[in-house]
Amino acid sequence: MKRKLIAAIGIAGMMVSIAACGGDSDDDGKKAGADGYAGETLTVWVMDGSSPDDWQADLAKDFEAKTKAKVKFEIQKWNGIQQKLTTALSEENPPDVFEIGNTQTPAYAKTGGLADLSDLKGEIGTDWSESLNKSAVFDGKQYAAPWFVVNRVVVYNKKIWADAGIKELPKTRDEFYNDLKTIGEKTDAEPIYLPGQNWYHFVGLVIGEGGELVKKDGDKYVSNLADPKVAAATETYKKFQALSKAPKDKDEATPQQGEIFAKGKTGSFIGMGWEGATAIATNPAIEKDLGYFTIPGPTADKPEGVFLGGSNLAVAAGSKKQDLAKEFLKLALSDKYEGGLAKANGVIPNKEALQSNLKGNAAAEAAAPAAGTGDTTPLIPEWAAVENDPNPIKTYLTAVMKGKSPADAAKQVEGEFNKRLAQQQ
């Protein structure tokens, strides 16, 4: 799920007021008495499309039965959410519980805007997947609860692959590459649509190599694009991109790659499962030829590295209903509702034991095997500014795709990369 982060300058501007509000949570946050939390209403912000209406309605009903309190869901848009949430967390009555992008969590935790949920982790989160929970922890404390993630898969055209004589799906990166070459040799189709700036897939390749995009230099973070592991990931990206006619200076959304695929002249692309639905909406006839498989890694026993984009649930440090908020999280993250969300939306749940709910959803089944070893962008508050346009990682990729060595391209963007990492949070 693509989240374009806004400059963290807005977070910095509110840091003092957020921290001042944190901890003022005992006015109404009383423990439930004989009548539970009767008469109270919990405000929960969730992002548009993250949870179905019936999921919310059932949860609200069960929550009221359990606590005697009501829950008010308020639907938010991703566009502008960082500034809106930053402002809300600095005010007298912030949302009690809110959905937050997994890579955004560290910045809010650093400002003091999030309540410490370490006790809740011990109670309900002992079996949360480590790869999902990583983004919810900052400075050794649990500041959010992992809710779900999504990751990229190979979306492919079954007819084109069959026309090329390919009878089995690839299990390794080399097999995948050779199959794409075969498509190019035996059909008129473009083997893969891979623009030069699909940086989320590039991040996955870096993860697969065991590389890091940043490193510590004294007390600050700096670019690590010159690292040999990052260079190896870049060479892999370039090798596959050379099989594509896609522009080297555009990303997967310019134009939407699902719409390109819908024309029926492309063998595959690397994207989110929902991009298959985009293709079908553009050309319903493509549905019968649409398939998904896990991005193959160097060996058959381990999928390619993937970027895990998703959401956490957090409690505002300034909420006056923190005990009630934790009761909400216990229910929302229970197997019933966590599994139900996975089934309804095809997202990867926070426990591996709940992945059985993905059965029958071809895109989700293809994504699940890689989730356990996937990772995110660097989970540091300083990262937020890096992703703002023009993203220096995109600039780096385009430079390599157009002929520069990874080392020279890394040197080209290093100044801008480091400047962004140095911005005050």
UniProtKB/Swiss-Prot annotation:
Principal subcellular localisation of the protein: membrane
Covalently lipidated residues, kind S-diacylglycerol cysteine: 21
Membrane topology classification: Lipid-anchor
Residues where lipid is bound covalently (N-palmitoyl cysteine): 21
Signal sequence extent: 1-20
Annotated knockout phenotype: Disruption of the gene decreases (GlcNAc)2 uptake. Mutant shows higher chitinase activity. Null mutant shows medium-dependent development, only failing to produce aerial hyphae and spores on glucose-containing media. Under conditions that allow sporulation, highly aberrant spores with many prematurely produced germ tubes are observed.
Origin superkingdom: Bacteria
Induction entry: Strongly induced by (GlcNAc)2, (GlcNAc)3 and colloidal chitin. Repressed by DasR.
PROSITE patterns (alphabetical): PROKAR_LIPOPROTEIN
Assigned keywords, A-Z: Cell membrane, Lipoprotein, Membrane, Palmitate, Signal, Sugar transport, Transport
Pfam families: SBP_bac_1 (PF01547)
InterPro entries for this protein: SBP
Subcellular location: Cell membrane
GO CC annotation: plasma membrane
Subunit structure: The complex is composed of two ATP-binding proteins (MsiK), two transmembrane proteins (DasB and DasC) and a solute-binding protein (DasA).
Family from the record: Belongs to the bacterial solute-binding protein 1 family.
Role description: Part of the ABC transporter complex DasABC-MsiK involved in N,N'-diacetylchitobiose ((GlcNAc)2) uptake. Binds specifically to (GlcNAc)2. Can also bind to GlcNAc, (GlcNAc)3, (GlcNAc)4 and (GlcNAc)5, but it exhibits the highest affinity for (GlcNAc)2. Involved in the control of morphological differentiation.
Protein name: Diacetylchitobiose binding protein DasA
Record organism: Streptomyces coelicolor (strain ATCC BAA-471 / A3(2) / M145)
Annotated gene: dasA
